[in-house]
Amino acid sequence: MKNVLYILALLLPLGIQAQTALYNSGNIRIHNEGQIGFHTDLINNASFDQNLGLAGFYGSSMISVSGAFMPVFFDTEIANDQGVMLNTGISASSNTNFVAGNFVTPRQQQDIYFNFLQDAFYVGESDPSKVDGYVTINNEQNFIFPVGDSEQLRSLTL
């Protein structure tokens, strides 16, 4: 009987799985001066658009943002050398801080993009940190897009 318990105790961890993404199926809100750091994938299948704090993407392996709804962040930051793959777009309503790594959008899907809302701005763009793919801006006449390819910043002026 003791041997059976030992065997079960050894096999139990094989059936346990860790959560590999933050899955939003309700309402998440970042309150004024609040901060959330994503170190894993984000699957956003519900409203995530009434935010006033900072949403940061951190880590040392690529993070994916996907889901049925586009998240809208107030302040956004990327500090992930491997980048953030956007499988659904994201919007920034205030500051985007490029520290390290690229926001990457699929080249074959123009409807997935990094969106700067009216009066949004960015800092820190560089060869290793920018948007590698599609970017949009809302209600602005003049804007310099922080875009480029996988190796080099190639800003585009509107």
PLM features per residue range, with description:
Residues 17-158:
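Extracellular beta-sheet-rich ligand-binding/adhesion modules
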Residues 1-25:
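Bacterial Sec-dependent N-terminal signal peptides
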